[in-house]
Amino acid sequence: MALKKRTVVSPAAGAVSLPSLMADLPGTRRLEEVPLDKLSPAPADWNFYAPLPDDKLLELIESIRANDLLHPIVVWKQPDGALVILSGHNRVRAYTALLEKTGEDKYRRIPATVLTDITADEAHEIVVDSNYVQRVLTPSEKARSISQKYALAGRKKRSRNGVRKSKYEQIGEEYNLSARQIARYVRLGSLDGS
């Protein structure tokens, strides 16, 4: 599968924003409010990232209470109607905590970009890319992210000028890293068992 060309840069490297990443989402999408109790997390092997520490989660809760949710979560609607969280696990945790603490009905549903007509590989890529954009990753998380991105990437493809690019070069352009750095992260990620 050939991945869609986009630039994805981590916060440590001067991030592309989450909204700009979300503007390039594949598939059919619509914005709606979805019930918290209908959401399920992405598979653990896709979403291996540590949850926010308690102090950062409290900051998120207070921000949502004061300003509402600034960025909708992203969910993948399965053919059976199940909703899998692709981006926003911590926002769902914050909404759940607010519902438990306040009992207010407005926290029973959360704004979401609902995606349909996407593949499992595209869904997996959204989990990896959104976490890469939003967080300062540990070295092992970064290696595992890049290793998974590499596994999802297609074979060599031609660039606009007709030159073939390796998967390392393709991902390096997206993540603002050299092909050599990508190769190193892929090797490190494979040591981690991803």
Regions found by a protein language model. Give the residues of each.
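A short acidic, often aromatic-flanked loop/helix-cap motif at beta-alpha or helix-coil junctions
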Residues: 118-122
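Short, charged/polar connector segments at secondary-structure boundaries
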Residues: 2-113, 124-136
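Short, small-residue-rich loop/turn micro-motifs
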Residues: 68, 116, 186
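Short, low-complexity interaction segments enriched in Ser/Thr/Pro/Gly
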Residues: 1-2, 162
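Alpha-helical interaction elements
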Residues: 133-194
